[in-house]
Amino acid sequence: MDNQSDLAIVRRAYAKQTLAAARISDPRLQTAFAAIPREDFLGPGPWLAFHVPGFYQPTVDADPVLLYVNELFGLVAERRINNGQPSLHAALLAAAAIQAVV
């Protein structure tokens, strides 16, 4: 998906679904998850998606839309180092109750 406006729609849906999976309602977190490109933390695709019972499978191509799911992606798969599960990140950020400094 090359169209940035289409990818922005995908990111907004991802943010809403991620917070719902974590059972969180926080507009600031939802905005943050929608605004920050996940692919910036994963390097160039195709990417390695982690699947239970413990193996990584490459994405079909390097389309960043494939990253906007509540799944782990391998950074160093042979060492089982991944980027972390988005809903867990959301839950931890919500629990931290970070406040804006003005």
Where are these regions (language model features)?
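Class I SAM-dependent transferase core
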Residues: 1-102
